[in-house]
């Protein structure tokens, strides 16, 4: 029996401690990314306003790409987790090798799409004075896509084994290097040239390369990974494994991409209302990221645990982990949400001096609290489905929840009904809760089918 699963039995009533042990390192790693986003925005914004605007456009584009790319690589986790639970660790190396090739090919597809977009940047209605800033920053970010693919592959492999601390330390180290690099290259410190936005891009590229190398280095030198290292190097590519990775990866990529695109389109709709609502919306998106990193981190831990128990054919524990993960997410949302709710009249002032913005933020925080139930539900059971390798239905469910229900409802309430930004935000709880309930019902249906 693997050390990670020795103490796990169907008699165990709850799995909170084990979920936290795997989930907290994921959350800490993601917290570093959020802090990096704050630092990037702060440093670029203090250098110049046009650079901040240019960075916002490019970062939104690459954010959508990286969310989708990461979603594709998620296909590896249930494969590794199932084999680990079955104690068939001798098969893991071949799966990782095939996943690496599939992930690199997918990275090339994303890169090609971004090259096409780069060649058409002048046609998407951006101010001419920003294009000279956007283009070099875009190219430097483009150079990092495949390195992120390497990092994602190694992360999902190690996460599948329950080794989530490795990626946590790599991400923390990469973020520290990025912040220091920003300081040196944006402002021209210690004899380096003052590169502004381009310096921020170069710093990001270097940190992503080092993160990828750190993960590969851990695999190649770590004492605990000798068996996997040998199997990865000696194994061969197979059509069946390559197809399996694509079968599991693309639905998750599409599901996460649609979720991200729906929020981006909501931001566009808020922009139609003017500067004040858009500023309030940006404050709320920043706040919601803090909830996101906790909910998604715990949900990722749940997917790992569920895949392990699927390998052991312990379906009682599969169900218990899913619902324990949901309860933990609700508890975290409550613990984080209570101080945010109590400080709702002060929080807007931390970000902006405008009283209208602060009033909008105070009201929108109430809606943010309401949609935490639906957000926790959909993160939990989307990852539970990922853990049991049932991912195709999520594409349809995400399309229905976000593009058939949430976006049209937000538009209808916001504009024809005259509720403005409040109407757009009222739609979020509906879309997220409906998505979560569809995922939950599908999880129960698939699990009952497997149990028979």
What are these regions (language model features)?
Residues 1-23, 80-146, 192-250, 306-371, ...:
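Short alpha-helical transmembrane segments in multi-pass integral membrane proteins
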Residues 11-42, 46-47, 63-75, 79, ...:
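N-terminal transmembrane alpha-helices
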Residues 21-40, 140, 174, 207-211, ...:
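Transmembrane helical elements of multi-pass membrane transporters/channels
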Residues 24, 28, 58-61, 101, ...:
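Hydrophobic residues within alpha-helical transmembrane segments
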Residues 31, 35-53, 121-128, 184-195, ...:
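Helix-terminus/linker motif at the lipid-water interface of multi-pass membrane proteins
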Residues 33, 37-40, 44, 66-73, ...:
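Alpha-helical transmembrane segments and their lipid-water interface positions
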Residues 52-115, 148-167, 267, 280-344, ...:
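Small-residue-rich hydrophobic transmembrane alpha-helices
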Residues 73, 77, 141-159, 167-175, ...:
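Short runs within selected transmembrane alpha-helices of multi-pass transporters and secretion channels
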């Amino acid at each position: 029996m693997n050390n990670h699963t020795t103490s796990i039995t169907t008699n165990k009533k709850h799995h909170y401690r084990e979920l936290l042990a795997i989930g907290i390192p994921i959350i800490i790693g993601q917290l570093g990314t959020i802090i990096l986003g704050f630092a990037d925005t702060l440093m670029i914004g203090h250098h110049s306003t046009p650079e901040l605007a240019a960075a916002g456009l490019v970062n939104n584009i690459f954010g959508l790409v990286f969310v989708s790319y990461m979603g594709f690589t998620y296909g590896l986790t249930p494969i590794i987790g199932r084999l680990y639970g079955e104690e068939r660790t001798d098969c893991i190396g071949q799966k990782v090798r095939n996943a690496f090739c599939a992930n690199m090919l997918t990275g090339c597809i994303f890169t090609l799409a971004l090259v096409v977009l780069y060649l058409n940047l002048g046609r998407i209605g951006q101010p001419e004075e920003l294009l000279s800033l956007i283009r070099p920053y875009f190219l430097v970010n483009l150079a990092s896509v495949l390195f992120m693919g390497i990092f994602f592959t190694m992360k999902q492999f190690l996460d599948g084994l329950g080794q989530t601390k490795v990626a946590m330390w790599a991400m923390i180290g990469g973020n520290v290097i990025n912040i220091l690099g920003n300081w040196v290259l944006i402002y021209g410190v210690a004899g380096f040239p003052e590169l502004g936005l381009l310096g921020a891009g170069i710093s990001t590229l270097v940190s992503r390369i080092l993160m990828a190398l750190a993960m590969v280095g851990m695999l190649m030198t770590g004492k605990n990974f000798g068996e996997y290292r040998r199997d990865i190097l000696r194994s061969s590519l197979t059509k069946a494994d390559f197809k399996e990775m694509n079968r599991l990866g693309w639905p998750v990529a599409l599901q996460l991409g649609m979720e991200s695109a729906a929020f981006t389109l909501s931001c566009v709709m808020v922009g139609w209302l003017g500067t004040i609502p858009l500023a309030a919306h940006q404050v709320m998106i920043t706040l919601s990221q803090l909830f996101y990193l906790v909910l998604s981190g715990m949900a990722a831990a749940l997917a790992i645990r569920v895949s392990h128990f699927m390998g052991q054919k312990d379906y009682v524990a599969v169900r218990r982990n899913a619902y324990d993960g949901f309860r933990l997410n609700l508890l975290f949302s409550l613990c984080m949400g209570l101080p945010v709710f109590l400080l709702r009249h002060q929080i807007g002032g931390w970000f902006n001096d405008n009283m209208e913005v602060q009033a909008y933020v105070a009201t929108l925080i109430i809606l943010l609290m309401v949609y935490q139930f639906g957000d926790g539900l959909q993160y939990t059971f989307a990852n539970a489905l990922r853990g049991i390798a049932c991912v195709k239905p999520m594409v349809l469910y995400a399309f229905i929840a976000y593009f058939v229900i949430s976006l049209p409802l937000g538009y209808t309430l916001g504009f024809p009904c005259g509720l403005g930004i409040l109407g757009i935000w009222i739609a979020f709880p509906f879309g997220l809760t409906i998505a979560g309930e569809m995922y939950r019902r599908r999880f129960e249906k698939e699990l009952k089918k497997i149990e028979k």
